Every structure is written in structure tokens, then in C-alpha cells.
UniProtKB/Swiss-Prot annotation:
It holds the Pfam family Voltage_CLC. The gene is Clcn2. This is Chloride channel protein 2. Residues 653-662, 698-707 have a biased composition (Basic residues). Keywords: CBS domain, Cell membrane, Cell projection, Chloride, Chloride channel, Ion channel, Ion transport, Membrane, Phosphoprotein, Postsynaptic cell membrane, Repeat, Synapse, Transmembrane, Transmembrane helix, Transport, Voltage-gated channel.
Length: 908
């Protein structure tokens, strides 16, 4: 059937005298390029022979130069041309291929990550060097210990605020919003990239409890966006929004992969924290780029002689034959449950700190004027508490985060029955056993102090994350449980034939994964831990603890990233709660807004102005008439404002005055003499044609798509927006304000005294050919505008979306949430057999979900559910009335948006 159709099409084309061309539709149904082109050539040739047409290669040179037929030529010139064309296409296509893009992205991010780690290590070593060099003078040592991080944090905050304030914070909440379809201006630009990299390096080099993973997701996304712009020079495929979204999803995985050298965990973590629904076709992009980036990152460490070979970032040496006993599983479960409560408390504390600072208006205004004072004070407080000769000796204050993790993951036991073992521990491990305290007290103080310090430090307006501080706190908590188990079982766990000692380092690994998973609401932290440590021996305890921690934390608080989204008031859609069966009984008709801002197809400009005053939304519904409410499409607010501005523009008013002057100066023929009174002039002005196109004869022309119009419409709109602003002041104030301001009132009062003089000037200008422009009094302008507002609207001069997203009133809340999450829409119209009855936005959906989640165990019936029974009884009558609306519909012409190809793409 397909072959017959193709042959018939080729025959018809040949019969009409058209040049032979390849059938693109048929090409998608065959294997291989050569077979495909040969088949198309054979079918066209058969059609030509059957109809007796001329041979194409004996025709014009253009026919012989057809690309599809060049390879059948025998001349050397044709073969050279074929080779050059193929080489050009190969180079362009290969440079634009995904794997080239992903290799470049992974390489750049690995270089950035390694360079930042090197700079951070140098900064931390400088702080330690100054502290050790001044150990003879405690005051100078304290000043050096405190001043160094204060200077770095202050520089980071100031540099970020000056160059790009969008670089502040983690970046994962914003990327989650961007991947959902929201556009954040100046968030993926080059200056934001520079501010993020330099600011993050200074912030982490200060030694504050800040993280790197979240900002690196943002850095990788910016790198992908900039790389897409560069590669768009070779091929336009990267200019498409869908392709950019796919590359951003892969970039999020690269950010985690090159940060921890954990490609598998990076891909899974990026999916969990940024996506609700993930396209599986992007899986290979994320894994390929993350793996390549992690490989280059570790190769650079070997090249710099930091490592002997490619190994894990925090290599451990746990027992592989018997890593844990069955009797230890309850302890691992306790770690998971406690980490769940701890993660929820961390998110709550972080949010409360921000809310308290915002509610204190006096402090907030003072700190807003002194933007660098808050980060300096917080850094001063934390540095003072971590000063090693002072209180910092009881919380291992002299250790960096990397050194802390290395000591916490140590597989040797630090204590036996509460006392330090006589073992040759590394110098870093000695920091956990100060002279006047034991390991337990040091770990408890470390956990408590680092907990609130990390929650406070992550609120500093610098590029920073919270994953690494939480990871360290969880490792310390797990180490505390492990050391407690080692003290309770000093001889180890007895089995049938042997005894196995407790490994506290394994408990630290479990605690780190559990607390990090509880704060971020992810399970992939378990995989990240396996790749960080290089061992998978504790896979079962880690998975048990992470799952339990997630179960507890998700029932108490949102994730840290969702909490930041709410704090920053970004558009978000909360997840449906667990075990809330009443949300399946809530329908769209229970939560929708019934008073929908709309405009009718036959409305006037006055109706448009009223619709703009009623709502601040971005879209307005377009209906057939206020009686039928048949939804025809949606129109953007900017389009409506452009229509009103063009209708009341000074250029249009000058055009009417010029017509009026020509009518006054033209000699009367078979008509009465032109009136000279003021009222007659106003009558003539009001009776001029006031259609939007400016000419009376254009009102009956067929409607034209907005994207195919000539420059005349855009020129008139530009003149209307860039004309004389002083003469348009009254029009704009009457359009957007209920009453004129005091300055306008005083100007009107002053102009009343010279109205007669202005009217005389108008009459003189009407009788003179040398005056280029006539003037109108404010009263005449207002009267003219009132007349213009009563004119019908011609929607052919604006872009209309003929297929806005729609729902039916019986759609469940669960299904609506799934649709909004999957498609990334922010509003949907509710229709009943084509009739507009309501609208649902993210605000209504969010309120409904949060209301069902926070219900106090009582199954409350939806507020409008009581009307369903009565509505069901009258459904037949309602259906009959709605069907009756389709009969007497007036045949209005509805303009379409864009070209037919655009609408076809939308249908697909």
C-alpha cells in the first residue's frame, strides 16, 4: 500500500512537470541510506518511463546536480563533489553529536573540579600553617585563625553580590525549577559561572562547614548551557529547548560525578533531586558524561601525585569475609531511624533560621544595608568556637572535612571500655581524644555543634551546599554508635566457631549515608557511599538505614531542596502524601477557580481593559461569547496590552487628526459647508473610522496569521509604543489606573485655563497647510479614547494559542498532579464539553495537596463533594443545553498561531 501510494505520488508529480525529488515520507520506512535512495530513484524513474517524460540527466544542469542523483554519475567531477559534500556533512554532524558534547562537558567539569580542589587545599594548608607558626602566642594565633576565614567569606559574599547574585546558594533547587520548565533569567550565564566558581572556592577554602556538591550541579548546568551556545555555531540542534533540557539533565549528573568521583551515584542522585519523571533516553547521556568526568578527575589526581593510582576518594579497608554480624542489624536500624529524625530537624532548623531573620524587620533592614556584615559575623562565631586551643579541642576543630571523614571511616577501634587504646593511631585520629575528655564526649560535642553550625552556615549568602556537612555529621553519629557497640562488646560478637570484632568505621559509613539521605530525601546516597569508600561490603546495612531514614524524614519535613524552593518562593508542586486516601476522592471541580478571567471573540477594547484589571495572570482565556463560554483558545497578557496600546496610541490619534484636517481643507462638493464650531469638530473626529488596522477597507479582509504579517503592523505598534509619551500620558493613566494621579490632576487643572487658546490653535492649524500636526485638548483626548474603547477588537493582529491545556471537571487530584508533573504545565482550563467552567493553577493544586497531607487523621469530605449527587441528576439536562450551543454559533473567524507546520508540530 505504501509503495503504491509513493508511485502514485511520483506519477502525479511527473505529470505536473515537477522536478523529481526524494520522498521523505517513504524514507522512514526502509533500511539503510543506499537502499533508500536507490528505491526512491527507481520509483521516480518508473513513473517517468510510464508517463513518457524526458530523462532527468539529459535536462538542465540543475537536474543533474540533484544531491540524491549525484552518486549515479560517472564523471570524476561528480565524485569529487560527492566526497566534499559527504565530508562536510560528516564533520558538521559529528561536531554536533551528543557524544562530542558530553565528552567536552565531562572534560571541562573534571578540570574545574580538580582545580578547585587544589585551590581549596592550598587555602586550608595556609590556615594550618599560620596557626602552627603562631602557636607561641595564643592571641596572635586566635587572630590569624579567625581573620583568615572572615576575609575569605567576606570576599566571596561581596564578589558574588557584585558580579552575579544568582550564584548564591546551592543551585539544586533552581535547577529543579528550570528542568520543570520555568525560566530563571541570568541563571545560566557566563558571569554567574565565574561568580559561582570563585565564590565557592573562597567559601570552601575558609574551612566553614559548607558543601560542594549542590553548587557543582549548578556549575555543570551553566557549563552545559554555555557549551550548547558554542556548539550551536556548528549545528542548530542545540538551539532547541528540548535538546537543552536533555543536556541540562546530563549536566546535573556530571556535577555530582566529578565532585565525588561517583558516576553511578551521581546519575541516580541527580535524577532523584531534580526530576519527578525522568526520560530513560537520557540515561546513557548521564552515565557517559559522569563516567568520563569522574575518570578524568581521578587521573588528574594521579598526575599531580596525590594518588598512586585511580582509587576511591575515601578508601576504606573493612573486612570482606565477615563485615558484620546479624546481631548488629538492630543497631544499623537504630542509626537509620535516628538519622531520619535528625534530617527532619536539620531541615526545620535551617528554615526557621531564615524565617526568624526575615520576621525581624529591624535586623533585616540593617543587614540588607550592610550585606557583608551577616556572613562576617557568622564566620567569626563559628571560627571562634572551632579555635583548636580553645573550645575547638573538644570537637576536633583543627581537622578539615576531608581529614574528618578519613578518621571517621577508620576501621580500627578507638576505645575499649571507654578508654583510648594503646595503638599507634595517626596524628589526625589523636584529635578525637583530647587530654581532658574521651572519645564519646568529643563525638557528642562534635555532632551537636556541627549540627547547628552547618544549619546556620548554609544561610550565608555565598555559593555553598549542605550535602558534605550533613554527610560528615552522619558519619560522626555512626562512629559514635560503632564505638558504643565496641565498648559494650569489647571481645566482639561471638559466633559458633569464632569471634568477630566490631568495626566502627562501618557504622560511620551507614550513618553518613542515612543522614544525607534523610536531608535530601534520596536513596542514591547509598550508592554514592559505596563509590566513595570503594567497598560494597556493608550494602545491606546501608540500604536498611537509608530506607528507614527516608521513611521517617519524608513523613515529617520536605527535603532540604524543596524547603529552599519554598523559602525562595519558586514555583513548585509538592509531592502527594503517604497513606492519604482522601486525595483520591478529590476532583478538579472541588479545587478549581470558577471565576475565570476571559475575553470574548466579539468583545470591545473596554472589555479587554476590564479583563486586565481583574487579573494579573499571564494568560487570558478566549471564549466564543459570554453566553456560550465555548473555549476557543488562550491569549497572552502582553498581546492584550499591545492591542490596547496600539488602539490608543498617539500615532493613531495623529492619524485621525490628519484625516480631520484634510476633510476640513478639502472643498465641499454636493455637501454642506464644513462646520466651524467646536462641537462639530468633535463630531467629525468621533465619526472617523477607528478600526485597529487604521483603514476602513481592511476590516473585511481575511484574517492573517500573526507570524506571516508584513512590517506594517509591527511598525504601527512600534510607533504606538515609542511615540510622544507626554501626549500619551492621559491614555495610559486611564488604561492602567482607576483615577489619575495628583500630578495629572494638577496638569489638567492648569490646562483648563488655556483650553480656548488651544482650541483656537487647532482651528488655525486646520486651515493652514504648514502646520505638521494638529493638537487636541485633554477633554477631546478623553472623549476620543472613550470612543476607541467601544470599538470591537480585531484578534487577527495577535497570537492566539488555539489548543490550551484542558481538563474535565471529574479528573481526580492524583491524576491532575501526575499530569502537571509530567508535562510541566502551570495552569489548565477546566471544560465541560467544550464550555469553560474553571481554571486550575499550581496555587490551587498546591493548596489541595498540602491540605490533604496535613489533615489530622480525619477523613474530611471535599467541600464541593456534596453537590455531586445533585449534579449527577442534572447531567442529562446540562449535556442537552451544551449541545444546543453548537447549533446557533456565529461563524467567527479564529486566527491561528504561527504557520500550519507549527500547528502540526503541536499536534504531534
Amino acid at each position: 500500500m505504501a509503495a503504491a501510494t509513493a508511485a502514485a505520488a511520483a506519477a502525479a508529480a511527473a505529470g505536473e512537470g515537477m522536478e523529481p525529488r526524494a520522498l521523505q515520507y517513504e524514507q522512514t520506512l526502509m533500511y539503510g541510506r543506499y537502499t533508500q535512495e536507490l528505491g526512491a530513484f527507481a520509483k521516480e524513474e518508473a513513473a517517468r518511463i510510464r508517463l513518457g517524460g524526458p530523462e532527468p540527466w539529459k535536462g538542465s544542469p540543475s537536474a543533474r546536480a540533484t544531491p540524491e542523483l549525484l552518486e549515479y554519475g560517472q564523471s570524476r567531477c561528480a565524485r569529487c563533489r560527492i566526497c566534499s559534500v559527504r565530508c562536510h556533512k560528516f564533520l558538521v554532524s559529528r561536531v554536533g553529536e551528543d557524544w562530542i558534547f558530553l565528552v567536552l562537558l565531562g572534560l571541562l567539569m573534571a578540570l574545574v573540579s580538580w582545580a578547585m580542589d587544589y585551590a581549596i587545599a592550598v587555602c586550608l594548608q595556609a590556615q594550618q600553617w599560620m596557626s602552627r607558626g603562631l602557636n607561641t602566642n595564643i592571641l596572635l594565633q586566635y587572630l590569624a585563625w579567625v581573620t583568615y576565614p572572615v576575609v575569605l567569606i567576606t570576599f566571596s559574599a561581596g564578589f558574588t553580590q557584585i558580579l552575579a547574585p544568582q550564584a548564591v546558594g546551592s543551585g539544586i533547587p533552581e535547577m529543579k525549577t528550570i528542568l520543570r520548565g520555568v525560566v530563571l533569567k541570568e541563571y545560566l550565564t557566563l558571569k554567574t559561572f565565574v561568580a559561582k566558581v570563585i565564590g565557592l572556592t573562597c567559601a570552601l577554602g575558609s574551612g566553614m562547614p559548607l558543601g560542594k556538591e549542590g553548587p557543582f550541579v549548578h556549575i555543570a548546568s551553566m557549563c552545559a548551557a554555555l557549551l550548547s551556545k558554542f556548539l550551536s555555531l556548528f549545528g542548530g540542534i542545540y538551539e532547541h529547548e528540548s535538546r537543552n533540557t536533555e543536556m541540562l539533565a546530563a549536566a546535573c549528573a556530571v556535577g555530582v560525578g566529578c565532585c565525588f568521583a561517583a558516576p553511578i551515584g551521581g546519575v541516580l542522585f541527580s535524577i532523584e533531586v531534580t526530576s519527578t519523571f525522568f526520560a530513560v533516553r537520557n540515561y546513557w547521556r548521564g552515565f557517559f558524561a559522569a563516567t568520563f568526568s569522574a575518570f578524568i578527575f581521578r587521573v588528574l589526581a594521579v598526575w599531580n601525585r596525590d594518588e598512586e593510582t585511580i582509587t576511591a576518594l575515601f578508601k576504606t579497608r573493612f573486612r570482606l569475609d565477615f563485615p558484620f554480624d546479624l546481631q548488629e542489624l538492630p543497631a544499623f536500624a537504630v542509626i537509620g531511624i535516628a538519622s531520619g529524625f535528625g534530617g527532619a530537624l536539620f531541615v526545620y532548623l535551617n528554615r526557621k533560621i531564615v524565617q526568624v531573620m526575615r520576621k525581624q524587620k529591624t535586623i533585616n533592614r540593617f543587614l540588607m544595608r550592610k550585606r557583608l556584615l551577616f556572613p562576617a559575623l557568622v564566620t567569626l562565631l563559628i571560627s571562634t568556637l572551632t579555635f583548636p586551643p580553645g573550645f575547638g579541642q573538644f570537637m576536633a576543630g583543627q581537622l578539615s572535612q576531608k581529614e574528618t571523614l578519613v578518621t571517621l571511616f577508620d576501621n580500627r577501634t578507638w576505645v575499649r571500655q571507654g578508654l583510648v587504646e594503646d595503638l599507634e593511631l595517626p596524628s589526625t585520629s589523636q584529635a578525637w581524644s583530647p587530654p581532658r575528655a574521651n572519645v564519646f564526649l568529643t563525638l557528642v560535642i562534635f555532632i551537636l555543634m556541627k549540627f547547628w553550625m552547618s544549619a546556620l552556615a548554609t544561610t550565608i549568602p555565598v555559593p555553598c551546599g549542605a550535602f558534605m556537612p550533613v554527610f560528615v555529621i552522619g558519619a560522626a553519629f555512626g562512629r559514635l554508635v560503632g564505638e558504643s557497640m565496641a565498648a559494650w562488646f569489647p571481645d566482639g560478637i561471638h559466633t559458633d566457631s569464632s569471634t568477630y570484632r566490631i568495626v566502627p568505621g562501618g557504622y560511620a559509613v551507614v550513618g553518613a549515608a542515612a543522614l544525607a539521605g534523610a536531608v535530601t530525601h534520596t536513596v542514591s546516597t547509598a550508592v554514592i557511599v559505596f563509590e566513595l569508600t570503594g567497598q560494597i561490603a556493608h550494602i545491606l546495612p546501608v540500604m536498611i538505614a537509608v530506607i528507614l531514614a527516608n521513611a521517617v524524614a519524608q513523613s515529617l519535613q520536605p527535603s532540604l531542596y524543596d524547603s529552599i524552593i519554598r523559602i525562595k518562593k519558586l514555583p513548585y508542586l509538592p509531592e502527594l502524601g503517604w497513606g492519604r486516601h482522601q486525595q483520591y476522592r478529590v476532583r478538579v471541580e472541588d479545587i478549581m477557580v470558577r471565576d475565570v478571567p476571559h475575553v470574548a471573540l466579539s468583545c470591545t477594547f473596554r472589555d479587554l481593559r476590564l479583563a486586565l484589571h481583574r487579573t494579573k495572570g499571564r494568560m487570558l482565556a478566549l471564549v466564543e461569547s459570554p453566553e456560550s463560554m465555548i473555549l476557543l483558545g488562550s491569549i497572552e497578557r502582553s498581546q492584550v496590552v499591545a492591542l490596547l496600546g496600539a488602539q490608543l496610541s498617539p500615532a493613531r490619534r495623529r492619524q485621525h487628526m490628519q484625516k480631520l484636517r484634510k476633510a476640513q481643507l478639502s472643498p465641499p462638493s454636493d455637501q454642506e459647508s464644513p462646520p466651524s464650531s467646536e462641537t462639530s469638530i468633535r463630531f467629525q473626529v468621533n465619526t472617523e473610522d477607528s478600526g485597529f488596522s487604521g483603514a476602513h477597507g481592511q476590516t473585511h479582509k481575511p484574517l492573517k496569521p500573526a507570524l506571516k504579517r508584513g512590517p506594517s503592523n509591527s511598525t504601527s505598534l512600534q510607533e504606538g509604543t515609542t511615540g510622544n509619551m507626554e501626549s500619551a500620558g492621559i491614555a495610559l493613566r486611564s488604561l492602567f489606573c482607576g483615577s489619575p494621579p495628583l500630578e495629572a490632576t494638577s496638569e489638567l487643572e492648569k490646562s483648563e485655563s488655556c483650553d480656548k487658546r488651544k482650541l483656537k490653535r487647532v482651528r488655525i492649524s486646520l486651515a493652514s497647510d504648514s502646520d505638521p500636526e494638529a493638537e487636541m485638548s485633554p477633554e477631546e483626548i478623553l472623549e476620543w479614547e472613550e470612543q476607541q474603547l467601544d470599538e470591537p477588537v480585531n484578534f487577527s493582529d495577535c497570537k492566539i494559542d488555539p489548543a490550551p491545556f484542558q481538563l474535565v471537571e471529574r479528573t481526580s487530584l492524583h491524576k491532575t498532579h501526575t499530569i502537571f508533573s509530567l508535562l510541566g504545565v502551570d495552569h489548565a482550563y477546566v471544560t465541560s464539553i467544550g464550555r469553560l467552567i474553571g481554571i486550575v493553577t499550581l496555587k490551587e493544586l498546591r493548596k489541595a495537596i498540602e491540605g490533604s497531607v496535613t489533615a489530622q487523621g480525619v477523613k474530611v469530605r471535599p467541600p464541593l463533594a456534596s453537590f455531586r449527587d445533585s449534579a449527577t441528576s442534572s447531567s442529562d439536562t446540562e449535556t442537552t443545553e451544551v449541545h444546543a450551543l453548537w447549533g446557533p454559533r456565529s461563524r467567527h473567524g479564529l486566527p491561528r498561531e504561527g504557520t500550519p507546520s507549527d500547528s502540526d508540530d503541536k499536534c504531534q
